[in-house]
A protein has these predicted regions:
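An N-terminus-focused feature that recognizes amino-terminal "leader" regions
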Residues: 1-182
Length: 182
């Protein structure tokens, strides 16, 4: 709102530039083999949400099923270390999503699991993964709207919404609690 009015930032398809990374592999999630599914599950479990009071321990089924059953394809970008091509150092996923704003339905891609190896942070990996994924996606699709989830403090990007998450430790709850349903 402050610098650029709401709308599409880039109408033309992007070109490879200094942020494009050749070591990022762009994959349709439907085409992942069992080995890659295990790799991304382990990577997300080890390097996504590394906060003191939060722990995300996904299963392969919980990750892969998140991308099934959509009207369009879901995508994954994997960035490997330049000196050790078997070492995954960054990743990002996108899945199709329909949102309704002011009674207008928009088709977009929701960005999730943007994740960088703990030992590789603060090296500019995330922007390169994002740009390379964006470029590859735009050359495959006409859809040019991407929605990012931002965890932490608000930045210069104007948020669509702001909300709080709450965590509850249910491991010590002594009985099953039921809630009234309408």
């Amino acid at each position: 709102y402050w610098l650029i009015p709401p709308g599409i930032i880039q109408h033309h398809k992007p070109e490879k530039d200094k942020f494009y990374e050749i070591n990022v592999k762009f994959i349709e999630i439907d085409n992942l083999n069992t080995q890659k599914k295990a790799l991304i599950t382990k990577f997300i479990g080890s390097h996504y949400m590394p906060h003191k009071y939060e722990k995300y321990v996904p299963t392969k089924k919980s990750i892969v099923s998140y991308f099934n059953g959509h009207n369009n394809k879901s995508y994954l970008s994997l960035m490997y270390d330049k000196t050790n091509l078997s070492k995954l150092i960054g990743m990002m996923t996108t899945r199709p999503l329909d949102i309704i704003i002011d009674n207008n339905t928009l088709q977009l891609y929701y960005v999730d699991f943007l994740c960088v190896h703990k030992n590789e942070r603060k090296k500019g990996i995330a922007p390169r993964v994002i740009y390379t994924h964006y470029l590859n996606h735009r050359h495959k699709h006409d859809n040019m709207i991407f929605l990012f989830k931002r965890e932490g403090p608000v930045t210069l990007i104007v948020p669509l919404t702001i909300y709080n998450n709450y965590l509850f430790d249910v491991s010590r709850w002594s009985k099953v609690t039921t809630f009234d349903e309408p």
